[in-house]
């Protein structure tokens, strides 16, 4: 179990967004399941150590890289799923947000 995204919350979201498990593997819902990941734009991916979907994010970063795409990936091991909105209350979350913004800026130049 991870806070704040736990099994009950994940089940709620899945049941709401994917009734009867329809479209769980649709590329827009699960980009890592896309059959062709080649020739995509550069990606900046940040995953969190305490996140039930961390492994999916890590696998997606590896799959993009294996397909020949430019990928910048950080796993912020001490953070939770919601770290992107916690920058004002957590120094570690703030540092993670700054790092991701700097990485994204490199690709946007």
Go through the PLM ranges and name each one:
Residues 1-109:
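Alpha/beta-hydrolase superfamily serine-hydrolase fold, recognizing
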């Amino acid at each position: 179990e991870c806070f704040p995204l736990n099994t009950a919350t994940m089940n709620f979201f899945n049941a709401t967004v994917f009734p009867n498990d329809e479209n769980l593997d649709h590329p827009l819902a699960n980009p890592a399941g896309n059959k062709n990941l080649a020739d995509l734009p550069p990606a900046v991916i940040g995953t969190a150590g305490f996140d039930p979907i961390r492994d999916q994010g890590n696998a997606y970063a590896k799959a993009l890289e294996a397909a020949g795409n430019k990928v910048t990936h950080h796993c912020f091991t001490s953070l939770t799923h919601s770290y992107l909105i916690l920058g004002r209350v957590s120094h570690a979350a703030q540092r993670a947000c700054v790092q991701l913004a700097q990485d994204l800026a490199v690709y946007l130049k």
